[in-house]
Curated annotation (Swiss-Prot):
Its EC number is 2.4.1.141. GO terms for molecular function: identical protein binding; N-acetylglucosaminyldiphosphodolichol N-acetylglucosaminyltransferase activity. This is UDP-N-acetylglucosamine transferase subunit ALG13. Involved in protein N-glycosylation. Essential for the second step of the dolichol-linked oligosaccharide pathway. It comes from Eremothecium gossypii (strain ATCC 10895 / CBS 109.51 / FGSC 9923 / NRRL Y-1056) (Yeast).
Amino acid sequence: MSTTTKSKMEGPKTVVVTCGATVPFPGLVNAVLDRRVLAELAQCGFSRVMVQYGRGFAAEFERQVGAAGAVRAACDAEGLEGCDAHAWRWQGLEIIGFAFHAQMESLIGTSAALVVSHAGTGSILDALRQQKPLIVCVNEALLDNHQEQIARRFEALGHLWAIRADVDELAGALARSTRETLAPLPPAYKQGFAELLQDVAHR
């Protein structure tokens, strides 16, 4: 793969997980909060995971965090003002959850050393144009598969890692992110992401 310079992030090494604002993605949340994935995150040197889990999913998110064995903690992370964010601790790993963030791309730009995202094109673009390493998790429960087609095509071009909502696949992708460097998104996105997607789909 082509190499790209990774920007140095200040503060705790953070992975930002975005599940989409409107439709919850339980499979991705389940995978992220699995103890094996949390352990892999710690093994990869992360000390904080921020999870944007979507509206209407707060109670279930808190239940799953508790089931993983995390304990409630104070939330003092920057950039989350007005998000009603809550924090937990799991063996030294800080877990922060919130339903929605109005400036998700900005949060990714300032906080993320790695992004784990659902396969919505907007979220993919948020991460790629910030030149962040990106793991895209395809929601197989959706009726159409255009998101999977886009994610797999971008993976083939070396821009991201595409997986299913599976604990083993996510843990494996996290490990790969420590060994591999992705190709940056070309300047073509400035002409409009729709044009870029059309171009990618027909290569």
